[in-house]
Amino acid sequence: MYSGVVSRTNIEIDDELVAAAQRMYRLDSKRSAVDLALRRLVGEPLGRDEALALQGSGFDFSNDEIESFSDTDRKLADES
């Protein structure tokens, strides 16, 4: 879907958001967090290895459970 061409880019980014993404998805670098976020935003499906890497990341809810979360539940989850 995409060319796979990689370039170096300097960006100003919220360190707290990056750290939260790294914790949530157990990512080992800022680059991994930004890469995952862009792929999810653009909609490119995760490859098999990428999907397996997320296994056990702590996100284990059904769609029904997610839809039933209140704002308070979401805030508590963000704080953990």
Curated annotation (Swiss-Prot):
Pfam families: VapB_antitoxin. Mg(2+) binds at residue 67. Induction: Induced by hypoxia. This is Antitoxin VapB15. InterPro entries: VapB_antitoxin. Mn(2+) binds at residue 67. Residues 60-80 are annotated as: Disordered. One of its GO terms (molecular function) is metal ion binding. It comes from Mycobacterium tuberculosis (strain ATCC 25618 / H37Rv). Residues 71-80 have a biased composition (Basic and acidic residues). Crystallizes as a VapB15-VapC15(2) heterotrimer and as a VapB15(2)-VapC15(2) heterotetramer; each toxin pair forms a homodimer which creates a channel in which the antitoxin binds. Keywords: Magnesium, Manganese, Metal-binding, Toxin-antitoxin system. The heterotrimer binds 1 Mg(2+)-Mn(2+) pair while the heterotetramer binds 2 pairs. Both metals are shared by the toxin-antitoxin pair. GO terms for biological process: positive regulation of growth; response to hypoxia. Antitoxin component of a type II toxin-antitoxin (TA) system. Upon expression in M.smegmatis neutralizes the effect of cognate toxin VapC15. Partially inhibits the RNase activity of VapC15. Its cofactor is Mg(2+); Mn(2+).
